[in-house]
Amino acid sequence: MSQNHRILLLNGPNLNLLGKREPGIYGSKTLDEIVADLKHNAIELGVTLEHLQSNAEHELVSRIHQAMGQVDYIIINPAAFTHTSVAIRDALLGVAIPFIEVHLSNVHAREPFRHHSYLSDVAKGVICGLGADGYQFALTAAVHQLRAA
């Protein structure tokens, strides 16, 4: 492979509490464990994976802006911002970097307010309800799409 693709992983609010917060819904793996596994798999796939978790919407928006021209694909678990953030949607549309939306839980089987996403209709794909494995599936899909382009 002649090009080392760069993938940005973004995680939204409260995901820093994974492993402690409602493990029956979100699983027992910590975010650090999930990211370490992803970085290991990224190396095996020959891509670079960068990560940011933030509880602040503006930090996620700023990182998306910084990704323009620097990142080839975004994997994002916007967490609660899924249901509220026009700003993140507009940032993703503004940089025109393809992205996959990931959720650990099946948001469609939860409270009605979690059923709507401001990102799903503009994402390349959405993975939900598969726990931490969803991140791995998203990474694999992103790499396949980049190599097919």
Swiss-Prot record:
This is 3-dehydroquinate dehydratase. Substrate binds at residues 77, 83, 90, 104-105, 114. PROSITE patterns: DEHYDROQUINASE_II. It is an enzyme of class 4 (lyase). The keyword Amino-acid biosynthesis applies. It comes from Aeromonas salmonicida (strain A449). The record marks 21 as: Transition state stabilizer. The gene is aroQ. The active site is at 26 (proton acceptor), 103 (proton donor). SUPFAM superfamilies: Type II 3-dehydroquinate dehydratase. HAMAP family: AroQ (MF_00169). GO terms for molecular function: 3-dehydroquinate dehydratase activity. GO terms for biological process: amino acid biosynthetic process; aromatic amino acid family biosynthetic process; chorismate biosynthetic process; quinate catabolic process. Keywords: Amino-acid biosynthesis, Aromatic amino acid biosynthesis, Lyase. Transmembrane segments: none annotated.
